[in-house]
Design a protein with these regions (language model features):
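Short glycine/serine-rich loop segments
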Residues: 64-108, 117
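Basic nucleic-acid-binding alpha-helical/helix-turn surface characteristic of O6-alkylguanine DNA
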Residues: 1-62, 66, 112-129
């Protein structure tokens, strides 16, 4: 597993999309597992909002609404950053929020993936998702 993960990271940090995923077995609540599975489905070089993910979960569960803040909490408890790409999740209106390794690293990862950064901004402290 470690060899596969190293190979995946080597490919990723060369600025290419790896064509495989090493096996991952993150430990978390059922809700966190659902969110992390969705994160792994966000295509390389794209982003989703916390609200997008909340709406996807709500549809799958047959409920009217799901909290974007609850999604943010699950994203924040992801211990396998990059492989479970929480850096691809952004706030509504393009705000770059909530990356445990810091917003500078989030910006670098999105830039590495050639995401168009012109539509994003770093919010002032205290701004919600």
């Amino acid at each position: 597993i470690l060899g596969e993960t190293k190979r995946w990271l080597d490919i990723y940090f060369r600025g290419a999309e790896p064509d495989f995923m090493p096996p991952l077995h993150p430990i978390g609540s059922d809700f966190q597992q659902v969110v992390w599975k969705i994160l792994r489905q966000i295509p390389y070089g794209t982003t989703r909002t916390y609200g997008d993910i909340a709406a996807q979960i709500a549809r799958a569960r047959g409920v009217a609404k799901m909290s974007a803040q609850a999604v943010g909490g699950a994203v924040g408890h992801n211990d396998i950053s990059i492989l479970i790409p929480c850096h691809r999740v952004v706030g509504k209106s393009g705000s770059l929020t909530g990356y445990a390794a810091g917003l500078e690293k989030k910006i670098r990862l999105l830039t590495l993936e050639k995401v168009d950064m012109s539509r994003f901004f770093v919010p002032k402290k205290g701004t919600a998702l």
